[in-house]
């Protein structure tokens, strides 16, 4: 059993052959989320994977109401084992936005952002953690199209992207959907720069 200790919490990863192991992108999103989240907030993490980011928030903030979604059944079990309430579903599909409890102050997403051709797909469930489609933005664009319906007035999203994903393209998409987009964190890692973009409803 692999474990990672970070931000006052020890995360159990279980079978890392099927679950994305938290790395620099996970750490950067967790750090950004800790700065953005406040006590009393309703928070949703989409595609929570092992539950790393959610578990860090739960360990460091009091009185938050946190829900997560995850499509990979192995990762969903891992997130539950780390104390995260998780619904196994694709993005927002298992959540009904018309219910008041399903409107959130803050939504987090670390999407698969690697441009991926059919030949580059990873076998099995782990592909969901890496495969961003040909543009690297396919899953992110689906998320952005739906996110607004799940936010409270003035709500915010935090998304982790790579310089490979195309920062300006992402900001333009967010702007077209009624978000004010700002970069709140960035970190150079080997061949890419990791970037956390905040979108605030206008």
Spans of model-derived segments:
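Auxiliary N-terminal substrate/complex-recognition segments of SAM-dependent methyltransferases
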Residues: 1-202
């Amino acid at each position: 059993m692999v474990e990672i200790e970070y931000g006052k919490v020890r995360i159990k990863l279980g079978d890392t052959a099927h679950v994305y192991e938290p790395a620099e992108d996970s750490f950067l999103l967790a750090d950004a989320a800790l700065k953005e989240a406040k006590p009393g907030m309703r928070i949703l993490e989409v595609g929570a994977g092992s539950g790393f980011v959610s578990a860090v928030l739960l360990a460091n903030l009091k009185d938050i109401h946190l829900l997560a979604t995850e499509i990979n059944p192995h990762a969903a079990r891992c997130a539950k084992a780390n104390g995260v309430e998780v619904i196994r579903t694709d993005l927002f599909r298992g959540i009904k936005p018309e219910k008041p409890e399903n409107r959130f102050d803050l939504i987090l997403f670390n999407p698969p952002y690697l441009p991926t051709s059919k030949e580059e797909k990873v076998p099995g469930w782990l592909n969901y953690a890496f495969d961003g489609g040909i543009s690297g933005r396919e899953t992110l664009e689906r998320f952005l199209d739906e996110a607004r319906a799940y936010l409270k007035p003035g709500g915010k999203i935090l998304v982790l992207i790579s310089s490979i994903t195309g920062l300006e393209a992402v900001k333009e998409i967010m702007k077209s959907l009624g978000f004010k987009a700002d970069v709140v964190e960035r970190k150079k890692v080997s061949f890419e720069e990791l970037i956390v973009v905040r979108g605030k409803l206008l």
